[in-house]
Amino acid sequence: MKGVFLSFASYCYTHFIFLYEISDLMEIIWLLISLVILYYGAEGLVTGAASLAKRMGISPLVIGLTIVSIGTSMPELIVSVKAAMNGQSALSIGNVLGSNFFNIGIILGISAIVYPLVVKKQLLRLDVPVMIGTAFLFFVLFLDHKISRVEALIFVLILISYLVYLLIMPRRKKVVDAEEDEIRLTRHWALDILFIALGLLALVYGSDLLVVNASLIAERLGMSEAMIGLTIVAAGTSMPELATSVVAALKKRSDIAIGNVVGSNIFNILFILGVAGLIQPISTPQINYLDGLFLIGIS
């Protein structure tokens, strides 16, 4: 009887280990699938955005600064708004700051390694100063560790003004550069919209799938919840920006690659913190002036 029990116990243990290993394997498989989804989502978004820009007669840089950057910032928006609604102010602001640090320090760096990025004059004269200005504005308004509803409204109004200026900016006749000349139009403008919409959906779903499975793998490896949050979740919400900018660089679309990063950093502060602050005034001592100074410096 004892032998039968030991055999049964051994059988159960063996199958438990087998199932555990299968579970690990499935998480790795889903992680790889999420990367594939991110790649093709970015491919569709960049293709649709570039074609739409050429069809509308506007610079792909403007598309990168608006449609692409706003779309790829959706994960940060969802996380920060949920955090604000739950009274988790530190998470709401930390998510935005962490994403902005990641965008410039990692995404722009990797994109430049993939393909040397050409910086347009508009970026240096308008968009980069706006990005630095929004970082400085956040630093000043957050010196008291609070973002009131009035201050949040100021963020949103500044963003609206910036977007309106971008879209109604005089379309000066210019020499078409090599990058824009190589852009291929899709068969119809509706396909551009479809590519952009499906690309954004794939990016949001792919980044969520990546975070979930990467977190499970990290837990099995013994990583703490705090460490997972500071690394995997923070990087995970920036996966759409990373995938889009890297694919844009591979396709030699410097304007979209850079515009996506600069636009996302502007959008993260002005819109995400603006909306989160309107829903629930933000107050936390966990984010200090050094974080704000670092944001200005890296911008």
What is the role of each PLM region?
Residues S7-F8, Y13-S299:
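Hydrophobic alpha-helical segments, chiefly the membrane-spanning helices
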